[in-house]
């Protein structure tokens, strides 16, 4: 897996393709174990969750070992934490257990250009994410709720995969990045090495 996890990004991991490959490996009786090379800075929380689930299904049938490349951060770590064993280079950048949302705001630009927009909508959230205006308080609250739910799920997945408590994961999470060597000391990685 090389790139960010996404269901749509041309430059990232297309989660559906990865999931299809993982399912084929699960069904292939000649495959006795899977080494999954992860070199990803992260990506979509949704795509990462889908791949995480596919890795969990695969490891019910055969051992899954993750070998981390230069980085396995955020969504890259999300995917990795489902493995039976995680191997990282001493300098691998990993962890980054955190989630953020980004809604562009082009209002300043449209104001400068003298552009204005009329919006007709069915309810107050119908144009949520409209870049022609800033978010209002209700939208910020809603987005924060989604971010918090996603973060809680990410922490839970890491706790389950690493056989640690959510509290232990939260102490080393908060979006922080660790080297492979430091990650091994805190339990995010099992073995230092490479392929």
Predicted regions and their residues:
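Small-residue-centered hinge/linker elements
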Residues: 1-66, 71-77, 81-161
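Alpha-helix initiation and N-capping motif
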Residues: 103-106, 166, 195
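Amphipathic alpha-helical substructures
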Residues: 165-193
């Amino acid at each position: 897996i090389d790139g960010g996890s996404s269901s749509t990004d041309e430059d990232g991991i297309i989660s559906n393709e990865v999931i299809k490959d993982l399912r084929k490996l699960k069904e292939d009786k000649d495959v006795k174990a899977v080494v999954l090379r992860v070199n990803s800075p992260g990506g979509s929380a949704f795509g990462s969750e889908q791949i995480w689930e596919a890795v969990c299904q695969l490891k019910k049938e055969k051992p899954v070992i993750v070998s981390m490349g230069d980085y396995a951060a955020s969504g890259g770590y999300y995917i990795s934490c489902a493995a039976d064993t995680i191997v990282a280079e001493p300098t691998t950048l990993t962890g980054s257990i955190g989630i953020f949302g980004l809604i562009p705001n082009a209002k300043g630009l449209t104001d400068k250009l003298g552009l204005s927009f009329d919006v007709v909508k069915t309810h107050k959230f119908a144009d949520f994410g409209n870049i022609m205006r800033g978010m209002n308080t209700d939208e910020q609250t809603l987005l924060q709720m989604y971010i918090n739910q996603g973060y809680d799920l990410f922490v839970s997945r890491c706790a389950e995969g690493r056989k640690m408590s959510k509290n232990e994961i939260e102490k080393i999470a908060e979006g922080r990045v660790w080297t492979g060597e430091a990650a091994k000391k805190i339990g995010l990685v099992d073995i230092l090495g490479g392929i």
